[in-house]
Regions:
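Active-site catalytic microenvironments in core metabolic enzymes, especially phosphate/sugar-handling
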Residues: 1-300
Length: 300
């Protein structure tokens, strides 16, 4: 039986873009490209794909250069010859602190910040909606946020089940969830997966559900679950006033969900490449302040 064919930089990039379409206000998709003048994404082979929310020590151990562990701090390049590391492509959601000097030659780093937040966290996430039992063909898109009329920040859909059943599914998906507020009913009919949580968005969700006919005029939000990342005071107060249940999974857990999903899809699409997912916190980069150079103007 023949081995699966190894993908190329171009093939993996195009596949990622089927889930994360480029957006004008997003970070550069090809965030870090090999500087070799002979580099060709159509022929550059990928043996290893590394996925992470941010650049972390674990990421650098996979995309960087070997380190000499015999030195203090293990930060000196090894002087000896070692086996060739795998040809690697990396994806980062928040790449802003990437140390490009530490990226191994030939490695491509892809990125998506806005598009990833929009479709692979708690927002317009149709995959998550389907897993929670929402009828996505009939779902409503919550669109327009912070002056951007095109930005999708949520999905609202019908899903008749108990509150406990929904929370159990959310726990399975994210590995963590908190029932921030239990509304006036333990029977959920509508789920709103939202990437924003404030008074205006809570009222917008209720109004959209009413316009669709899922909630009768004058009825409160007791049969609606608002699923989001972080709890916010204004959003919580508005939800409580409407009798609406609120579940929060945490901002980072929402991002990790997207990384896991990409990993699953990449393994299925490219069995010839090893896929590594890194889940750890980024170490803050402390940049040294430049000290102005002063000249001695005293007479000699």
């Amino acid at each position: 039986m023949s081995r699966p064919k190894k993908p190329t930089h171009a093939a993996v990039t195009q596949f990622v873009e089927t889930f994360l379409p480029p957006k004008e206000n997003d970070v550069q998709r090809l965030y870090h490209t090999p500087r070799n003048p002979r580099y060709d994404p159509e022929t550059a082979v990928v043996e290893q794909i590394v996925l992470s929310v941010t650049p972390t020590p674990g990421v650098y151990s996979l995309i960087g250069y070997p380190l000499d562990e015999s030195t203090i701090g293990a930060t000196t390049l090894l002087p000896r010859i070692y086996p060739r590391p795998p040809r690697t492509l990396c994806f980062l959601h928040r790449p802003f602190q990437l140390d490009r000097r530490s990226v191994r030659k030939g490695t491509l780093v892809l990125s998506s910040h806005t598009s990833f937040d929009e479709v692979l966290t708690v927002g317009w996430n149709t995959v998550l909606a389907e897993r929670l039992g929402m009828a996505t063909a009939d779902c409503l898109c919550v669109q327009g946020y912070k002056g951007d009329p095109e930005r999708k920040i949520g999905i609202i859909g019908w899903a008749s089940k108990s509150l406990d059943a929904v929370l159990s599914q959310v726990q399975d998906e994210f590995g963590a969830s908190e029932l921030a507020y239990e509304g006036s009913s333990d029977e959920i009919r509508i789920i709103a997966i939202m990437n924003a949580f404030n008074e205006d968005e809570v009222h917008r969700v209720l109004a959209m559900a009413q316009e669709r006919g899922w909630i009768m005029e004058g009825e409160d939000g007791g049969h609606l679950l608002y699923l989001t990342g972080q709890p916010r005071v204004s959003g919580m107060e508005a939800a409580k006033a409407l009798g609406m249940s609120v579940a929060c999974v945490g901002h980072r857990q929402g991002e990790d969900w997207g990384i896991r999903f990409l990993g699953q899809e990449l393994r299925k699409a490219f069995p010839g490449a090893r896929v590594e997912e890194v889940y750890e916190e980024e170490i803050p980069v402390v940049r040294e302040k430049k000290v102005p150079v002063t000249q001695d103007t005293a007479p000699q």
